[in-house]
Amino acid sequence: MAPNATTKKRAAAKDDDFVLTLSDDENDVLENGVEEDTLSSSKKRKRDAAEAPKGKNKKQKQLKKSKKGESAAGAVSDDQSGEEDEAEAMDAGEDDGALDSEFEFDVGGNANTGVIEGFDGWEARNGAGPADAPKNGDKKAVDIDDIISRRKAKKEAELKKKQQKEKKRREEEGEEESEDEDADSDGGMSVDFQDDELLAADGFGMGADGADESGDDVENDSNDSDDADEKGSEDEESDDDAAASDNDSVATPVHHPDDEAASDEESEAESEVDAEEAEKRKAFFAPEEKSTAASTSNRSFQDFNLSRPILRGLASVNFTTPTPIQQKTIPVALLGKDIVGSAVTGSGKTAAFVVPILERLLFRPRKVPTSRVAILMPTRELAVQCYNVATKLATHTDITFCQLVGGFSLREQENILKKRPDVIIATPGRFIDHMRNSPSFTVDTLEILVLDEADRMLEDGFADELNEILTTIPQSRQTMLFSATMTDSVDKLIRVGLNRPVRLMVDSKKNTSMNLTQEFVRLRPGREDKRLGYLLYLCNEIYTGRVIVFFRQKREAHRVRIVFGLLGLKAAELHGSMSQEQRIKSVENFREGKVAFLLATDLASRGLDIKGVETVINYEAPQSHEIYLHRVGRTARAGRSGRACTIAAEPDRKIVKSAVKAGKAQGAKIVSRVVDPAVADEWAAKAKGLEDEIEEVLQEEKLEKQMAQAEMQVTKGENMIKHEAEIMSRPKRTWFETERDKRAARKLGATELNGPSKKDKVKLSNKDKKRLDDARQRHEGNIGWKKGKADREAPKQGKNKGSKNKSDKKNNIKMKGKK
């Protein structure tokens, strides 16, 4: 007992000698901490308050380190806070993973923001993850607008300098010459006025023609919209004009002989296939329930018996009434059945499969984190959009998400995969990359597989990648396939491994939205080269904002982007040659209204949901009617109205015919837009006058890309020197295909979108390259031409004698050799 008493006395003496010195700020911190401790009554408040004293204790420790003996006091406070944290952790463990009704998980960061008005899947991303900031290393994007603005500034400076010189020269001439000569100099200035008058007259004529044309178009549209079902009356009205023979409708009732022959062949082929295919479908698909059709009318999300967090998530994005595809899909998906679903574009197919997935995941075991769902998309933009929609709907749950798409950091995605997120949203290529090369990613636990835009995923371009995924993931899974143009081919669907799937075809006839007006502008034979003039007229005079223009080729989209920039039209481009950061920036700029036109390839034709798209213009008709439906489906979504305008030439006759036929059967509005050929020729001439400047911009862009590539190579070399050991220790990433197989797959994918190429591209030999280079140099410089036949037959007299002597000598040498 004596030693204990002595130690207590010593400790008391030390405490008496120790004097606490606290500043005014630290007193305030302590008082606030006491008030927060008294307010924490529930478990949630205790958890929130537990983090605040920790931070304040750390701050106190940093401020007290300079004082003697303060470390001991800091240690005591840390021990006390540690004991409180352990006690709270034990209290939290008593729930055994159950959800508290008062507890709110805020994964997306918008739990308390209320209803999100006009949510379109491209809202600002608040949650952490790869969607926030794409990691592309040190790649520098080349901005076309910067190049064009620099060139304009340079031209303006040169013009200003030239004008100053001209003004100075005129002033000098005015001092030296007489008044008559001054009058002559004024006459010389009239040339500039004439030039200005020419420009003004040109602009005035254009404005007058455009106004008249727009008025005619409005009248034509109104007449056509009133009589959309009877196209013949439109043609009779247009015949009254003098130029009606050149500008009549594409949807003319006079059938082309090739069209009639093709339709007969197609009908015979369809009748033969239908019988066999019907038997296959009857054996493959599960029988449809007839009772569901009557019960799906006037239902709400509450009728599906969804959990409260899911209903709150739906209300937060202003989803109140389920669409027809959602009414059919959600009850069947909750039962765990395989689904093949189809509906028109903009009908809510994403929510149709996300909602039942979230509902099923709410009842998952929580002790061990496990990835249970994989959603595969054909494009990066669609995957990013689906990720945003899913995180918004799951705001009030504890379900975690991960997106695996190209263009983002592999390391960050691997770190997220280590946490085993519940739902993985990916493109096939990056999914296979992580499946083969990320040790923390396992697919053995997947229970649900979703293929969005499934008909595109089943095409030849994705066939090898899809087979690699399907043979790796478990066979005992729920599989759901969705698309606006879903295929019924049993042979293709068998590859996915479906087990008696349920067909949910809300739109089995591949129709467009009823609020969509389809327009067609016909190019007569021989006017295909004026296509750009028609596009510029439409974008300058008719459709001036919120327009998506679709192209078949990336090269054409990029070139038209430069033309738009030179003509002062604000536009952005979207295609596969851009980096992921550029692609997301283009979509965001268009969504926010910073640019009026989005020039895109078929990369953006599927699934992209941007609010307020008023018009879709097809620069060329697509390869198939299915692609046409996806393109025009970017507008007139979710009950809104929109227009689709297609510039069609003779090669596009088949697609236009099928679109008009489907539209008439549906009762959709089909309009023929008449454009004055003279106006289109003027715009085409303007575009042709910019060809030299376009080539200069392309050359400057090429040089900037080469500079950026060189800088990247230098940075790569520096990193190899600095971090050689770490880089060489990494395992080499593998792929299931060779480079030759990759090229073949890309070729098949291009063929699906653009049709077979007219001639196969073959790598040129060095001899062929040299021959082509020589021909190009001769053509450009008019040098190095060989003598023609006339020059060889009529040479000069002196050269003729010399040639005879040389020939005689050669003959003599030959004769001597024979002797």
Curated annotation (Swiss-Prot):
UniProt-annotated location(s): Nucleus, Nucleolus
Gene giving rise to this polypeptide: drs1
Organism: Neosartorya fischeri (strain ATCC 1020 / DSM 3700 / CBS 544.65 / FGSC A1164 / JCM 1740 / NRRL 181 / WB 181)
Motif Q motif, residue range(s) on this chain: 299-327
Compositional bias per record (Basic residues), positions renumbered to this chain: 55-67
EC numbers: 3.6.4.13
Record text about domains: The Q motif is unique to and characteristic of the DEAD box family of RNA helicases and controls ATP binding and hydrolysis.
Catalytic activity line of the entry: ATP + H2O = ADP + phosphate + H(+)
Record GO terms (molecular function): ATP binding; ATP hydrolysis activity; RNA binding; RNA helicase activity
Quaternary structure, from the entry: Associates with pre-ribosomal particles.
Biased composition regions of type Basic and acidic residues, renumbered to the chain: 135-161, 278-291, 732-742, 757-781
UniProt main location, coarse: nucleus
GO cellular component: cytosol; nucleolus; preribosome, large subunit precursor
Listed CDD domains: DEADc_DDX27, SF2_C_DEAD
Helicase C-terminal domain mapped to chain residues: 531-678
Disordered as annotated region, ranges: 1-299, 732-819
GO biological process, one term: rRNA processing
Compositional bias per record (Acidic residues), positions renumbered to this chain: 23-38, 80-105, 173-185, 210-243, 260-277
Protein name (Swiss-Prot/TrEMBL): ATP-dependent RNA helicase drs1
Family in the record: Belongs to the DEAD box helicase family. DDX27/DRS1 subfamily.
Cited Pfam families: DEAD, Helicase_C
Ranges for domain Helicase ATP-binding: 330-504
Motif annotated as DEAD box, chain positions: 452-455
Keywords per UniProt: ATP-binding, Helicase, Hydrolase, Nucleotide-binding, Nucleus, Ribosome biogenesis, RNA-binding
Function: ATP-binding RNA helicase involved in ribosome assembly.
Domain of life: Eukaryota
Binding site for ATP: A343, V344, T345, G346, S347, G348, K349, T350
